[in-house]
Amino acid sequence: MEKPLLPAKLVKKEADPLVFSTIIFLFRFLPITLALYYLAPAKLKNTVLFLCSLVFYCWGEVRFFPVMVALILINYLSGLAIEHFDAKPALRRFFLLVALIGSLGMLFYFKYANFVLRSVNALLGTAFAEIQGIGTLPLGISFYTFQTLSYSIDVYRRDVKAERNIINFGAYVVMFPQLIAGPIVKYRDVSDQLHVYKHRYNLKQIEEGMTLFTFGLAKKVLLADAVGALWTDIIGVADSPSTTFVGLANASTPLVWLGIIAYSLQLYFDFSGYSLMGIGMGKMLGFDFPANFNYPYISASITEFWRRWHMTLSGWFREYVYIPLGGNRKGLKRQIFNLFVVELLTGIWHGANWNFICWGLYYFVLLALEKLFLLPYLKKGRVWPHIYTLFLVVVGWAMFVGNDAGVEFGLLFQKLFLPSGGVMPLYFLRNYGVLLAVSVLCCT
């Protein structure tokens, strides 16, 4: 949500962040952090986790340190105030509003402000100057702002008690395993574990965590990076080390389809790989994070796809947007409207560009059609619902990657749907065919 850390659309490019798959993280940061954490007295484990996570957060951009501190303080103090004024609804609403404005305000300023200014200038012919100094995003801001939002809302709903220890709360917000790619962890998911100081973890948990981390790393390095090279070879980018890239304008329609399929595989292995590494590291530290992916490419409908893809994000929007708006309890028209709001916000969450908004609305249309009449027919089929779903998902990823480096949105869709000549895929099938086959097997 957002090729560096993740495929470029999920996390806006950072200034050399400390990525899970880098040598310095694998052989320096992670071993040192785990050693300090395991050796620390029980009462100091959260302090060690908090401080090490701050180092991780500040590694690439220390100038964003005040942003994290401010976000922690705003939500920590607001949570205490909401609980303190339990018998005064107006004050409770006021402090909830403070927390929401603080979290959403920071997210909007860093991620969307310049996009809004550019869009207004383009639509109205104005000449508002863009804000300087926010060309890169604070690391993981799309993820940890949603965590602070859920915390403040849950305290307001009385679903959880406000955290009184600021170190514990800070450790929850900035916990490095889930900071850059999720899963999005609600406070109630880890609140009990944050307050278990002795016997938080055991050797079996550490072993399970190491296994999950290794599988996630393999997904990222052996599959995502390798199959992503096919997409890069096809589109070509200015700083690509490859000397064999074709360029989108020179690619034939079959080659572009091969490339977008490769991108779809890369996106899944990259994102799910990072999430799995995060879940694994959480287990090593004694925390059980929720699963984030469940073989989404085996889905037989778009509805099922969104139950399997980025499950913590879908669950977040369902709990904090869809259900409060009325969910499916207020009639079909209201349900479709609620779906529209959720999918629009999902697109906006993934990035500050119009292609993300189009991508979100694209899925709204598909989900609405399934709600209205398609689902009963899809449930009757065996093979064709899977083909239908995969085709539409791949087309969606083409929309998602539109306007990325080396990709022109209009040209990409022209190549996909208006048959054209150019470089054919035979050379790339010879070089990547086995890898593609293995990748398909590993995601089904």
Go through each PLM region and give its residues:
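Membrane-embedded transmembrane alpha-helical bundles that form the catalytic cores
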Residues: 2-443
